[in-house]
Amino acid sequence: AMLSRFGHKLRVAIDGKEYTGTYMMAAICNGGYYGGGYQAAPYAAMDDGLLDIVLVKPISRIQVAGILAKYKAGRHMQDADTIVPEFRSFMTFYRARSVEMQVLDNRPIIATIDGECAPVMELKAEVLPSALNVLLPQPACSSAVIRGQYECPLQAKVR
């Protein structure tokens, strides 16, 4: 979700590697979509043990208006690891097992987790492999099949 129109100075540790910068938005995703159908991480797979992380540096409202539809549709990603050229000057992408964020400007960010919002000064997200069994519909297998990892058992039955 949008952190603020001006951004926040954050220290972000991604699998232990630290980055410091001003960001207006951060999306930490285990699945491809969040609130209202935004496809922040179009290649995310819930079964790969990794989080897909999108960080956005502050841009103008005019720029936001120009790119929002593409971002919502997941067209900011060229492939599973690459941001499209149009977004590269202000957007970065990472894939990791854990991410920690700490606010450095003394103004809390609003974290939204599963639709619940809370002001926080720091947060940590980490994948705990096989900690939870989740029943997914057939399309959930598609990302792993596209990446060639395995054949989805549900798709095999349909053929």
What label would you give each PLM region?
Residues 1-159:
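Long C-terminal subdomains/extensions of small-metabolite kinases
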